[in-house]
Structures are given as structure tokens and as C-alpha cells.
Amino acid sequence: MALLEICCYSMECALTAQQNGADRVELCAAPKEGGLTPSLGVLKSVRQRVTIPVHPIIRPRGGDFCYSDGEFAAILEDVRTVRELGFPGLVTGVLDVDGNVDMPRMEKIMAAAGPLAVTFHRAFDMCANPLNTLNNLAELGITRVLTSGQKSDALQGLSKIMELIAHGDAPIIMAGAGIRAENLHHFLDAGVLEVHSSAGAWQASPMRYRNQGLSMSSDAHADEYSRYVVDGAAVAEMKGIIERHQAK
């Protein structure tokens, strides 16, 4: 049966995902940046309360995946922290200036991660040569790759995803970006074994007083009185679709 991973941005969201049938959580901060390293407090609280596998993302900033020496030092420190806290896996990725896997740096990450399952995140979708990159990741011992098939969403990239799956047995190819209940069947019918979804919705802030004349964001038009949360009903619906597909 296909595995359902849900991207979560808080302990509450991780618990919602778990309660509604998620098989695994990718734990992140900063949804508008595409996911950044969660705080130590969030990591500890999730580790204590969530019982399904949780893989934190290790990504120090938004933007590209070519990092300064200082940023890379922080990545290694965060990898060690996640390992010490007892998480079963993590999600990360580093490219060089030419859009290839930064092999020396990824080797250091793999050494720091030790026995943890490492997912190479959507840095893969920004690489120059996906098949060569997949070979490099297999050489490193990467467990899985999260990809949209190098398109803006995974449905558009499904043909590339299938090409990657056909390329070899390892790493596992996990489809992600824009996967919802209404298009999930396309991936299941294609034989994709792992799917990643935010199953998310924007929820209004509980604040009654709102200073509408001031923003804490560099984007003056950002809505600071809403929060991105996991929609438990959406998770349950996707899980049900997977189970019914398996029963066919």
C-alpha cells in the first residue's frame, strides 16, 4: 500500500496528521519559504508526543540550495541534533554552483546522520541532470527523493517521476507538490509507492485585536492573521483513497 507523508509546520499539525491516518510526518517551519529547519523546542515537543515516524527538514534558509560555509556548518549541527533527539530520519539536500549534488558536503551530512534515513528534498527539482543526480544519490546511500518531476506540481511532472522510478530501485521516489485527494488516483494508478502532501488550509488567527496599519513581514501585503494548518479531514480522505485503491 502506498505510504502517505504529510508536511507539518507545528506539533499540533503533526498530531492532526497522525490522528487522521498519516504514515509519516515531514516536520518544517516557515511554509511560505517552502519549509525550513524547525526550532529546537518544536523538535523536542514533537519527539515527545508524536508516535508515527517524523523526519525533520534541515534547511537553514529559503531560496537556492548552494550554501555558504556558515550555513553548511549549521546544517551539520542540526543533523547531529536531530540524530541525538532520536528521530528516525531527516530531510535535506545540497547542490553545487552548477546544479549538481554537492558530493563532498552530502558525504559529510550522511556521516553525521549515521543510521538515520535521509530524504533528499526538492533540491532535486532544481538540479541540472536528474538521472545523473539520482545515480549520485544512490551512491551516497540516500533512502528517498522527494520530487515533483522538476515541474511546478507533481501531476505535471508525473511522466518524469515515472522515468525516475523506472531508473532503478533506490532511492525510493516520493512524489510531492500539489498532491490532493482529487488527483491522488493518478499517482496510485501509476504505481507511485510514496506520496507527500501538505493537506493544508489557511486558518484565521484567534486574535480579536488587529493592528491593520502595521506588518511584521517584509511583504506589506502578507496576511499575518492566518496560519497554515493540516486539514485532518483532507488527510483522512487521502488515506481512505489509498486504502480503497489497495483493496482493488
UniProtKB/Swiss-Prot annotation:
PANTHER family: COPPER HOMEOSTASIS PROTEIN CUTC, COPPER HOMEOSTASIS PROTEIN CUTC HOMOLOG. It comes from Escherichia coli (strain SMS-3-5 / SECEC). It holds the Pfam family CutC. This is PF03932 family protein CutC. One of its GO terms (molecular function) is copper ion binding. Disulfide bonds: none annotated. It comes from the Bacteria. It is found in: Cytoplasm. Homodimer. GO terms for cellular component: cytoplasm. Belongs to the CutC family. Its main location: cytoplasm. Keywords: Cytoplasm.
